[in-house]
Amino acid sequence: MLAMKRVLITGAGSYIGTNIENWLNRFPSKYQVASIGTINNEWKKTDFSSFDVVIDVAGIAHIKITEDLRDLFYSINRDMTIDICQTARESGVKQFIFLSSMNVYGDDCGIVTDKNNENPSSFYGDSKLQADKVIQSMNDDSFAVCSVRPPAIYGKGCKGNYPLLVKYGQKLPV
């Protein structure tokens, strides 16, 4: 019988974090799940050593990307991600899963394959790419690092462009 995995999710209360937590909680014999916030460095109060896996979904998204927010994007999406990953590694966590973004490929990448070049067209995408590169360098035999680069994420209650797309789509004749 497989041992129960102890999972820590950063980004408590976020759309993705909440949905991952709810899904994992459907399997109480397989996963013990906790989530933590990252606002005001709340995550730094957590002892990571009691967890097997950290799923990092914390970050800035769904706000207008403007030059005056550049430093904030890099501080949260790059620097905090690197700090959380480093803390997980130093605490003996076995696996780190980072929710990156398809935006690391730019706006016109088409279908993503292993042949795509990373070419972010915004500092949102660049901040995610820079985090990806640093945390991947921490990957080794005792600490598995995985970056997931999803396109748009949607579902019941989601934010972002999907609700707007649905709204306009309902008005189109079919």
What are the language-model segments listed below?
Residues 82-123, 138, 146:
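Conserved Rossmann-fold NAD(P)-dependent oxidoreductase catalytic core, especially the SDR/UDP-sugar
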Residues 44-79, 83, 87-90, 105-107:
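NAD(P)H-binding glycine-rich loop region in Rossmannoid oxidoreductase-like domains
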Residues 32-46:
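Adenosine-cofactor binding site in Rossmann-like domains, unifying the SAM/SAH pocket
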Residues 127:
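Active-site helix of classical SDR
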Residues 144-147, 151-174:
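NAD(P)-dependent short-chain dehydrogenase/reductase
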Residues 7-26:
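N-terminal Rossmann NAD(P)H-binding glycine-rich loop of SDR-like oxidoreductase domains
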Residues 19, 23, 87, 106, ...:
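Rossmann-fold NAD(P)-dependent oxidoreductase module
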Residues 10, 54-58, 96-102, 148-150:
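SDR active-site strand-loop-helix element
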